[in-house]
Swiss-Prot record:
Motif RxLR-dEER, residue numbers: 43-71
Protein name, per record: RxLR effector protein Avh5
Notes on the domains: The RxLR-dEER motif acts to carry the protein into the host cell cytoplasm through binding to cell surface phosphatidylinositol-3-phosphate.
Source organism (scientific name): Phytophthora sojae (strain P6497) (Soybean stem and root rot agent)
GO cellular component: extracellular region; host cell
UniProt-annotated binding residues for a 1,2-diacyl-sn-glycero-3-phospho-(1D-myo-inositol-3-phosphate): 81, 83-84
Subcellular location: Secreted; Host cell
InterPro entries named among the record's database cross-references: RXLR
Predominant cellular place of this UniProt entry's protein: secreted
Length: 135
């Protein structure tokens, strides 16, 4: 007989011997009865806050909803955020043409003016940084 078959038989024998147990060693946990006779003490209902009245949301047609365009326009017109964005673009090595090309790919007409102003701002920032590095 080959050594591989002998090893497989030895492992199988050890596995069957060690798998048998004495049922007295089992630790059984006690479980609650499936039929709940006294459920009143175990109920978790929201009966304590019946005095609080939650008003439903009312649709106000006069109030304009805030969409992502509004949030973007607000963020992109903030000078502090723009300088951070310009610095990140400059440190990443983007040229003015790359930034203009990337910002021109939008299909949103509401943000077109904001994107153009952002590209012009980056062009000014780019020229200023280039002139500082040239000195």
């Amino acid at each position: 007989m080959r050594l591989q078959f002998f090893l497989v038989m030895a492992v199988a024998t050890l596995a069957t011997i060690s798998a048998t147990r004495v049922p007295d060693d089992a630790n059984l946990q006690s479980v609650n009865a499936p039929v709940q006779t006294v459920t009143r003490s175990r109920r978790f209902l929201r009966t304590a806050d019946t005095d609080i009245v939650y008003e439903p949301k009312v649709h106000n047609p006069g109030k304009k909803q805030v969409f992502i365009e509004d949030k973007l326009q607000k963020a992109l017109t903030d000078p502090k955020k723009n300088k951070k964005l310009y610095a990140r673009w400059y440190n990443s090595g983007f040229t003015v043409k790359q930034v203009e090309g990337g910002l021109d790919q939008n299909e949103n007409r509401e943000l077109e003016l904001t994107y153009k102003n952002l590209a012009l701002g980056y062009a000014k920032y780019y020229q200023a940084r280039r002139s500082q590095e040239a000195k």
